[in-house]
């Protein structure tokens, strides 16, 4: 495991929001939480925030269909608003880095993060997490057997996202880094820590 976590977290210049996003089972939550721990950063996960807003326990299973139950557009909107509120509150307390973890499948939702962060004098870095379909299947099978899993992502959700996910346009979203998560977490943390966008 990398050993420069405290140095990196303390050396960040200004406010920064790190958004780990991608489709279900892309590895974003594993990496986002590891990065937040690595940097001693504040961390917020959309699955947890959504269930808090719905009055549910984080590990309570809700196999609702797309756009149904706790996954309606209205609650999704509230979830992303709450994520931004948390980040804003942290910045007001002089927190340097906030990590947001969620699908952020629409560019409009990513742009809202950019707008809020810029309004507070900060900057964003988006990490677009990807992996092969074979790995998605493997991870979803493991998740289905894990009683502590927070995400309700399933194969049908993945198939829906394949059709609807607004992938980042490198020409218009130049603050995005694409990362294949089929590698050791420690190696990914070292790679991220070396990125020029995090050096100042």
Predicted regions and their residues:
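The conserved Walker
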Residues: 24
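Small-molecule kinase domains that catalyze NTP-dependent phosphoryl transfer to phosphate-bearing small molecules
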Residues: 145-191
């Amino acid at each position: 495991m990398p050993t420069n976590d405290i140095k990196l977290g303390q050396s960040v210049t200004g406010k920064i929001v790190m958004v780990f996003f991608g489709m279900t089972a892309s590895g974003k939550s594993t990496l986002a939480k590891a990065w937040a721990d690595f940097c001693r950063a504040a961390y917020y996960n959309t699955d947890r925030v959504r269930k808090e807003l719905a009055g549910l326990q984080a590990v309570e299973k809700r196999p609702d269909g797309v756009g149904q139950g706790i996954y309606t557009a209205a609650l999704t909107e509230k979830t992303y608003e709450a994520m931004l509120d948390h980040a804003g509150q942290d910045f007001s307390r002089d927190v340097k880095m906030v990590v947001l973890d969620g699908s952020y499948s629409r560019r409009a939702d990513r742009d809202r993060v950019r707008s809020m962060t810029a309004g507070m004098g900060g900057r964003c870095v988006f990490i677009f997490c990807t992996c092969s379909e074979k790995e998605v299947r493997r991870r979803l099978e493991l998740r289905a057997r894990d009683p502590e899993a927070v995400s309700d992502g399933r194969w049908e959700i993945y198939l829906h996202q394949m059709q609807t996910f607004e992938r980042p346009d490198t020409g218009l979203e130049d603050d995005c880094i694409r990362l294949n998560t089929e590698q050791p977490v420690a190696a990914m943390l070292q790679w991220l820590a070396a990125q020029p966008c995090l050096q100042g």
